[in-house]
Amino acid sequence: QQVLAAFSADGALAKAIKGFSLRLVQQQMAEAVSDSISSRQNLVVEAGTGVGKTFAYLIPALLSHKQIIVSTGSKNLQEQLFYKDLPALLLMLGLSPKVALLKGRNNYLCQHLMEKELSGASSMDTQILDDLLRINQWAGQTTDGDLGGLTAVSESSQALPLISSAKETCIGQRCDHYDVCFTRKARNRAMDAQVIVVNHHLFLADKIIKETGFAELLPDPDVVIFDEAH
């Protein structure tokens, strides 16, 4: 079995991680997750510190080659999973599925609002204007518009709420930036990916939106994993 082989003494983890030692509890958890996926049954796992739960659920999920949504309890964990754990594991396992990170829309820069705010810059507070100019410079460099990657201004900057994407200010297809909209592109990537990393707030928001029958943020995957479900 591929899952057991990955955790074995000469498996993918042992070859890639210096000083790797087999942890029986981690292997047992991975087996339980694998069985749950293949039998399409729900599974609840309580894992103590040091078990290595992230690898224990990701490896069987990735090796199933099914469409997966991993939902985390915080944006910090979401980013660690997407930028660190997931790339490392895919490299170890020799896999290359399409992966996507999706956050709530207020985490993305709105080019329309950015343009609007800069057009009224003459009457603006100097600190806010300075921050807006820094954000605008970053906007020309970012590929995803995720404000989590913005380091040029403080997280508490008063400029951020002014240029964050919001349902209330979105003008949809009438927007000059519609084709390059960061929020729209992030959602399209998520719909097209095999592995999607979200947080609980977004996952549940998608469920509410789907109940209206008008829209959806996420696909209906084969596997959903809640990390930090408590």
Model regions and ranges:
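SF2 helicase catalytic motif II
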Residues: 218-230
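A substrate-engagement module of RecA-like helicase motors
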Residues: 2-16, 67-68, 72-196, 201
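Walker A/P-loop NTP-binding motif
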Residues: 34-35, 54-67, 84-88
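Conserved P-loop NTPase motor core
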Residues: 55-60, 94, 98, 208, ...
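Walker A/P-loop
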Residues: 39-57
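Conserved pre-motif I regulatory segment
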Residues: 2-44
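Conserved helix/coil segment N-terminal to the catalytic DExD/H
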Residues: 184-191, 201-219
